[in-house]
């Protein structure tokens, strides 16, 4: 059975693309059939996946998989949603995991009814992070009718020297969502930041603690 997961960003620079690529590539490495569906142009994502661009900004790849999708060099397939407002029914057969990656939350309204889970990324470098995540959840609630539609919050770019700020943000989010919906935070690390430049993933790094942080996310997703 396919699981459709929409990955949203509470603000710019929250790690939406980084988290999606590393989760999708891990599942693909484990033998799962995975698709990343792009809603709105994401140049960083396309370059990271090793997709060339045509003159009119359409991604290209030497290999096609399912009709309309492209193979990537890190494992998951890629699909440009364009104006589509739903996932083609054949994709439910072709894939086990589909990650929807809208450029902005405002572009996700038509996608929400088709999603099984909502994952929201946020950065602890941002001021009022908790408030922005809660505001996004309340906006999504107004669209879905669900009182707490966000299934998982991933705090990214945590600075281990700023425990007061980290604890305050975690406490506010845990009070609102419940601790079970707050993932273990991902550390701020230049090695992670540089991964797109080398078209690599966290699974190719030697730092076990970084791989473990993402693997804990994978374990949550596989339980959904």
What role is predicted for each listed range?
Residues 199-224:
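NTP-binding/hydrolysis catalytic cores, primarily Walker-type P-loop NTPases
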Residues 9-14, 29, 33-96, 104, ...:
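P-loop/Walker-type NTP enzyme "switch/lid" segment
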Residues 107-126:
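Inter-motif core of Ras-like GTPase G domains
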Residues 157-203:
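Beta-strand-loop-alpha "switch" segments that mediate conformational coupling across diverse proteins
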Residues 19:
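Hydrophobic positions on the alpha1 helix immediately C-terminal to the Walker A/P-loop
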Residues 127-151:
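Anionic-ligand binding region
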Residues 24, 28, 112:
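Gly/Ala-rich phosphate-binding loop of Rossmann-like dinucleotide-binding domains
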Residues 1-4, 141, 145, 150, ...:
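Acidic-aromatic/histidine active-site loop/patch
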